[in-house]
Amino acid sequence: MISYLKGIVAGIQNVGSNRVILTLEVNGMGYDLQIPQRLAKQLPTTGDLVQIFTHYQVREEIPLLYGFSSPAERDLFRHLLSVSGVGAASAIALLDTLELPDLVQAIIAANVQILIQAPGVGKKIADRICLELKAKLIEWRKSAGFFVATEGPAPGILEEVQMTLFALGYTAHEVSHALHVVSEDIGLPKDAYVEDWIKQAIAHLSSSEQVSH
């Protein structure tokens, strides 16, 4: 089994609307790997040396390679594939929608509303992911070297805050980051009013938009 490949970035191309293919030159051979869009944005320009952690799969007798930025990201991809009804496209969509710790936290907390923000992931699949992976990920996160963050609104408040922000057009990644900032930097209590969480999160998101412009 191929654990990782270390080689030169020969090219990155978008195939269709949601597939990104990295061509990696290793010892004179070119390997095509499907990678998350998030990884594609992190990779250096063509010609630079990189290390990509891989998952090998044979589908309909066609060998496929998937590439990831870390062993933890690859292992979580494999956990997602173990869930009935979850294919590579859905697993990569989840990895692209949320940062690794946020995705693990959402699954362990059975936060279906944030999981269904990933393209192609419906409520039924999200429920199944939470049901089948919660116990596994509680153990796995320890060996992976990180713990699920405890900041953010209390569970009873979180879903209402998230749904309000999603309705305003913010992405799952933007919402998770904003709630982290509001909790860690501003110090808003977990049991503060829903309106306070929403107000502070929007203030942060609005200021971030102004900076980006």
Curated annotation (Swiss-Prot):
Residues 70-148 are annotated as: Domain II. One of its GO terms (molecular function) is four-way junction helicase activity. InterPro entries: DNA_helicase_Holl-junc_RuvA_I, NA-bd_OB-fold, RuvA, RuvA_2-like, RuvA_C, RuvA_C_sf. Keywords: Cytoplasm, DNA damage, DNA recombination, DNA repair, DNA-binding. It is found in: Cytoplasm. One of its GO terms (cellular component) is Holliday junction resolvase complex. Belongs to the RuvA family. Homotetramer. Forms an RuvA(8)-RuvB(12)-Holliday junction (HJ) complex. HJ DNA is sandwiched between 2 RuvA tetramers; dsDNA enters through RuvA and exits via RuvB. An RuvB hexamer assembles on each DNA strand where it exits the tetramer. Each RuvB hexamer is contacted by two RuvA subunits (via domain III) on 2 adjacent RuvB subunits; this complex drives branch migration. In the full resolvosome a probable DNA-RuvA(4)-RuvB(12)-RuvC(2) complex forms which resolves the HJ. This is Holliday junction branch migration complex subunit RuvA. The lineage of its organism: Bacteria, Bacillati, Cyanobacteriota, Cyanophyceae, Nostocales.
